Amino acid sequence: VDVSGDAAAGEKAFRQCITCHVVVDDSGETLAGRNAKVGPNLYKVPGRHAGQIEGFRYSDSMSQAGQNGLVWVEEEFVKYVQDPTGYLREYLGDSKARGAMTHKVRKEDEAVDIYAYLASLGVHEE
């Protein structure tokens, strides 16, 4: 997985994500966040197909994007977190598509750094 951001800066920027997200490794250790369960566990998101965490109820649009082949590489992650619903509408070519994530990461460099931080915690290997 290619990463261009600053993981240390991403750790700080990730604070805006912990209201809804947690990063818990395969052994059950919490690497980031507290106990939020609103959004999916972000462990090993970099390199993973979208909408693939078992037991998490994704929006229909996110599930469809994953089935269509969306993989969380840096470029796609950065575009998504800046405008989740807009991204899914464009990706799926469906003006009615909706993302469940309401928060938008306002700054592109923060989104890049958050991706680097998540990659530092674990990368999905096929």
Swiss-Prot record:
One GO process term, biological-process aspect: photosynthesis
InterPro entries: Cyt_c-like_dom (IPR009056), Cyt_c-like_dom_sf (IPR036909), Cyt_c_1A/1B (IPR002327)
The record's account of how the chain is modified after translation: Binds 1 heme c group covalently per subunit.
Pfam families: Cytochrom_C
Protein's cellular compartments: Periplasm
Record: residues binding heme c: 17, 20-21, 101
Entry's Gene Ontology cellular component terms: periplasmic space
Keyword Transport annotated: yes
Gene3D superfamilies in the record: Cytochrome c-like domain (1.10.760.10)
GO molecular function, one term: electron transfer activity
Alphabetized UniProt keyword annotations: Electron transport, Heme, Iron, Metal-binding, Periplasm, Photosynthesis, Transport
Source domain of life: Bacteria
Keyword Transmembrane: no
Family: Belongs to the cytochrome c family.
Function: Cytochrome c2 is found mainly in purple, non-sulfur, photosynthetic bacteria where it functions as the electron donor to the oxidized bacteriochlorophyll in the photophosphorylation pathway. However, it may also have a role in the respiratory chain and is found in some non-photosynthetic bacteria.
Name of the molecule in the record: Cytochrome c2
Organism the protein comes from: Rhodovulum adriaticum
Source taxonomy: Bacteria, Pseudomonadati, Pseudomonadota, Alphaproteobacteria, Rhodobacterales
